[in-house]
């Protein structure tokens, strides 16, 4: 696709359904690290930005009945995801509030973002897209240029 179509961005979704048939290890941690290294080498060689969608293992509900917020360590092969990734984003739904949070879990290069920064979105069925979720508090705050 890089040579035929000239793609510059690739989304692998979901990661666990795309197998590495040349894998040399049955150990999930070693497999994950080797696979991520192959993806990184591909990205550098062809100058392609790759988003890897990796779902967490089973998440449990907290005492208040909400599903706990996962981290990169909740993905199968946990520590390798954090160690091998330059950046990590969390997309987490709050089904009660009907919002979706996007949170920065890891930023290797600090000029590209801030660890822990988050934004909230609401699904807009008419447009078929997510729109920024604005609370009354946020609406009252002036923008930096105001």
Predicted segments, located by residue:
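C-terminal regions of RecA-like/P-loop NTPase motor modules
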Residues: 1-10, 24, 37-47, 58-146
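Walker B catalytic acidic pair
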Residues: 14
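Signature of the SF2 helicase/ATPase Hel1-core->accessory helical subdomain module
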Residues: 17, 55-58
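Conserved ATPase-coupling elements of RecA-like P-loop NTPase cores
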Residues: 19-26
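Non-membrane alpha-helical structural segments and their capping/turn regions in soluble enzymes
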Residues: 26-33
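P-loop NTPase catalytic core of nucleic-acid-dependent motor ATPases
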Residues: 51
